[in-house]
């Protein structure tokens, strides 16, 4: 089998810039630092960061968010749902660096098949969404783990979102992938995965783990029997 990466386009990639704006992380870091200071001065058992929902009694240390190496452009903690489909990227978000703490990064998306330039098409069609209801996932060891949905920090509930990309259709055209010579090749589109750091539960403790999410749509080829180049 031969794998071909589908032509990248705005709706199948991580939001423009391949990273959450620095302003968002700066604001997040400021809030976490504030939560840490309050946690140190609060009575025992009254820490300001805890898991919401079914595991609301489990405490999460705000220091978990301080390490830059744990950040991923496909994982976002936000107090508001990211836009499902934004017309354009908000220039003020990156240009001025004045994004409010609970704003999310906006990126250009389209519900129809994208065309970069006239006559150019993607081999496979993909769709990208922010997933905010993930409860379980497969970690890098192949084990199913619990994913934390919400974290309460300083009385603000931050939800954990994942930017996932998957194939819209395994066969965008009758013969399989778009633009493939069906006389010599069998083809189909398939969703591929990668691993990102996500906040999960490890026993009764919150911990970062690599979990698998959908991140791309690629074309898989196999040569038809009896055909030679």
Curated annotation (Swiss-Prot):
Glycans are attached at residues 57, 102, 154. Keywords: Cleavage on pair of basic residues, Disulfide bond, Endosome, Glycoprotein, Growth factor, Lipid-binding, Metalloenzyme inhibitor, Metalloprotease inhibitor, Protease inhibitor, Secreted, Signal. The keyword Signal applies. Residues 7-109 form a propeptide. It holds the Pfam family NGF. It is found in: Secreted; Endosome lumen. A 1-acyl-sn-glycero-3-phospho-(1D-myo-inositol) binds at residues 161, 197. Belongs to the NGF-beta family. This is Beta-nerve growth factor. It comes from Sus scrofa (Pig). The gene is NGF.
């Amino acid at each position: 089998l031969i794998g071909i990466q589908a032509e990248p386009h705005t709706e199948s990639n991580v939001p423009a810039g391949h990273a959450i704006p620095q302003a968002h992380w700066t604001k997040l870091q400021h809030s976490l630092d504030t939560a840490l200071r309050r946690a140190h001065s609060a009575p025992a058992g009254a820490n300001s960061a805890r898991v919401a929902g079914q595991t609301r009694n489990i405490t999460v240390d705000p220091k978990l968010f301080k390490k830059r190496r744990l950040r991923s452009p496909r994982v976002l903690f936000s107090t508001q749902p990211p836009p499902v489909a934004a017309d354009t990227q908000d220039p003020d978000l990156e240009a001025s660096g004045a994004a409010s703490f609970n704003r999310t990064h906006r990126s250009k998306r389209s519900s129809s098949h994208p065309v970069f330039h006239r006559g150019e098409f993607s081999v496979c069609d993909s769709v990208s969404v922010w997933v905010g209801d993930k409860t379980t996932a497969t970690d890098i060891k192949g084990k199913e783990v619990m994913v934390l949905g919400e974290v309460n920090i300083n009385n603000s509930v931050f939800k954990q979102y994942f930017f996932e990309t998957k194939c819209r259709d395994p066969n965008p055209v009758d013969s399989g992938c778009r633009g493939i010579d069906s006389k010599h090749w069998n083809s189909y589109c398939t969703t591929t995965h990668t691993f990102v750091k996500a906040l999960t539960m490890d026993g009764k403790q919150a911990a970062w783990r690599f979990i698998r999410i959908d991140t791309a749509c690629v074309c898989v080829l196999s040569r038809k029997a009896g055909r030679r180049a």
